[in-house]
């Protein structure tokens, strides 16, 4: 799914410029992506479209997020640290963080990594046309690189 999201971010200016899901699915298939990866990405995009009514305002970085047992069992400590960092840097709101965590909890446990969390964060911010501080954006974009080579065509 990470590579599909990276492809979308590289090839479309924003969420609104993407073709309808059926056409996008065919386009991604023609680009050589796996059908299951395409389906998972389209599902995530649908969730984002349906959650567009939240506030994109940065949260008070002093707020404390308590993770449930299920979340602590599934989310690596590094991912929880990334979520706190993004809140502290005012890169995401509390609502956006919750959407990211919700999305991560629907991914198989062995696929939940810091890079996956970064890419899902980028997808969410891209969908909301959010501006990012340069250093935070660079940190998130690093997840789209594999061995210093772009994962996108």
From Swiss-Prot:
Cite the InterPro entries for this sequence: Smg
Give the top-rank taxon of the lineage listed in the UniProt record for this protein: Bacteria
Matching Pfam families = DUF494
**Family to which the UniProt record says this protein belongs:** Belongs to the Smg family.
For this entry, the protein name equals Protein Smg homolog
